[in-house]
């Protein structure tokens, strides 16, 4: 009876989406062991089915009340479920990109898919982790999978270098983060659960306020590296440039989603007593990230590096939602995160498709693409302009919601900085569009002149990347006009 009671108290149903992913990983491993030849299409179908089942379970959980699983180590509520949905959706959208990239590169898909699912699993657990040990282990799962994906193409020296850099920087940031967690553990008198630590902090002797500040700064520095916030961003352009492009698309979303969920939970549960001062730190990081990310993107010539610096600036915009605070602030962050997922993956899908057909990602090599492939050029332009926040595209409405929530909370300088940097970002996005639509024959690049494409009239025979582009471009371009259901979903995730 005692064992039965303990087992029922684990609430394993709450962990079912992650359990499906674990089963999926094990099944793919067993399938690879018993198969004589790698069946790439079968692997993609299996991973798709697992992720879709996981998403369906998450949608079902969203309609249920909050629960605590694994004796307090794992909390499931509407807010964490929303982030887990974003993470699993990101993985679903990145699998077609990976399949085509791996097929053209001639390397094994099995391990790549396993690392992709493993990283997704780490990010999902991180979003719902409720104690210090689970937080650190899930963060390391996310990090370890990221390092392996970054350096996956062993024959490419740039990929090897990127993987090694990421491993060293990631290990350093994890050490700083773990040091901050150890201070939380000590200051709380040996508690590992977030709410127990928060209770201890509410009764903390004022003489220990400096120590709690030190713990907070260590944690924010560790998370800052994961989010590529300025001044912790120096590693990301080099690492992302050397990584396989589908990995860059995947990590630019999934690391942000997991790290932002963790930041909100730690700031909201443990450090509400530091709310005003901690907001000052987050404001500074947001302002620096928006300014530096957009300014450095203006001088880049590689599409991957431009989108890397753009992702640094986007992390700054997303921080505005945390600074703005509960309800409206967090809801606007969730809405923009959903929109950013589709805008970013849509842009990367276009870059991957062009790269697979030409072998380049330099901006000037896109010159005149509209004359050869108007569909791809139009989709890429739409996704980039949406990232810039040009009305009436989806990105514009997402940014307006973020800025309005911060303005209502009184962060006027932060909002003005966000508006100014958004205007600056239009320059480098428009510059890319300008290259795409060049019509003069003499200006068309060598790669575009040699560019060839095949488009099937049948939807079922379309390239998987093209299907991705259809979906992401539609959402990036038009969903913002009808965004009320998305806002309702985000607000309900916060209010409940």
Swiss-Prot record:
What is known about what this protein does? NDH shuttles electrons from NAD(P)H:plastoquinone, via FMN and iron-sulfur (Fe-S) centers, to quinones in the photosynthetic chain and possibly in a chloroplast respiratory chain. The immediate electron acceptor for the enzyme in this species is believed to be plastoquinone. Couples the redox reaction to proton translocation, and thus conserves the redox energy in a proton gradient.
Which Pfam families does the entry mention?
Answer: Ndh2_N, Proton_antipo_M
Record note on quaternary structure: NDH is composed of at least 16 different subunits, 5 of which are encoded in the nucleus.
Which locations, inside or outside the cell, does it occupy? Plastid, Chloroplast thylakoid membrane
Superkingdom of source: Eukaryota
Transmembrane ranges, per UniProt, are 14-34, 42-62, 79-99, 109-129, 133-153, 167-187, 210-230, 244-264, 281-301, 305-325, 334-354, 377-397, 400-420, 469-489
Q: Which gene encodes it?
A: ndhB
Q: What is this protein called?
A: NAD(P)H-quinone oxidoreductase subunit 2, chloroplastic
Natural source organism: Chara vulgaris
Please give the GO cellular component terms listed in this UniProt entry.
chloroplast thylakoid membrane
């Amino acid at each position: 009876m005692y064992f039965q009671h303990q087992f029922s108290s684990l609430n394993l149903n709450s962990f079912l989406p992650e359990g499906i992913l674990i089963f999926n990983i094990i099944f793919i491993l067993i399938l690879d062991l018993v198969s004589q030849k790698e069946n790439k299409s079968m692997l993609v179908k299996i991973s798709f089915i697992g992720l879709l089942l996981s998403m369906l379970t998450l949608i079902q959980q969203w309609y249920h009340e909050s629960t605590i699983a694994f004796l307090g180590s794992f909390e499931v509520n509407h807010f964490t479920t929303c982030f887990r949905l974003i993470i699993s959706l990101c993985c679903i959208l990145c699998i077609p990109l990976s399949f085509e990239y791996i097929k053209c590169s001639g390397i094994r898909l099995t391990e790549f898919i396993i690392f992709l699912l493993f990283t997704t699993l780490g990010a999902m657990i991180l979003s719902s982790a409720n104690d210090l040990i689970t937080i650190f282990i899930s963060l390391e799962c996310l990090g370890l999978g990221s390092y392996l994906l970054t350096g996956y193409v062993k024959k490419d020296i740039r990929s090897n270098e990127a993987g090694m850099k990421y491993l060293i920087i990631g290990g350093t940031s994890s050490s700083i983060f773990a040091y901050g967690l150890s201070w939380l553990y000590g200051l709380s008198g040996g508690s590992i659960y977030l709410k127990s630590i928060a209770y201890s902090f509410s009764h903390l002797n004022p003489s220990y306020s400096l120590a709690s500040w030190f713990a907070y700064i260590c944690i924010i520095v560790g998370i800052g590296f994961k989010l590529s916030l300025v001044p912790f961003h120096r590693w990301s352009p080099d690492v992302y440039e050397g990584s396989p492009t589908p990995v860059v698309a995947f990590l630019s979303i999934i690391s942000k989603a997991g790290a932002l969920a963790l930041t909100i939970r730690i700031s909201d549960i443990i450090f509400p007593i530091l709310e005003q001062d901690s907001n000052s730190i987050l404001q500074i990081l947001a302002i620096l990230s928006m300014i530096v990310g957009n300014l450095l993107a203006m001088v880049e010539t590689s599409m991957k590096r431009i989108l890397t610096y753009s992702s640094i600036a986007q992390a700054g915009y997303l921080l505005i939602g945390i600074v703005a605070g509960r309800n409206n602030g967090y809801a606007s962050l969730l809405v923009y995160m959903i929109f950013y997922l589709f805008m970013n993956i849509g842009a990367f899908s276009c870059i991957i498709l062009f790269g697979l057909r030409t072998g380049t990602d330099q901006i000037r090599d896109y010159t005149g693409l509209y004359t050869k492939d108007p569909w791809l050029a139009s989709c890429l332009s739409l996704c980039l302009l949406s990232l810039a926040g040009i009305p009436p595209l989806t990105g514009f409405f997402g940014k307006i919601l973020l800025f309005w929530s911060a303005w209502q909370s009184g962060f006027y300088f932060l909002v003005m900085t966000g508006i100014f940097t958004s205007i600056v970002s239009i320059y480098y996005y428009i510059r890319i569009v300008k290259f795409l639509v060049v019509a003069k024959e003499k200006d068309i690049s060598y790669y575009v002149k040699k560019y060839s494409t095949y488009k099937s009239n049948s939807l079922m025979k379309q390239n998987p990347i093209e299907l991705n582009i259809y979906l992401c471009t539609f959402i990036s371009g038009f969903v913002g006009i009808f965004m009320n259901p998305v806002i309702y979903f985000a607000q309900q995730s916060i209010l409940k």
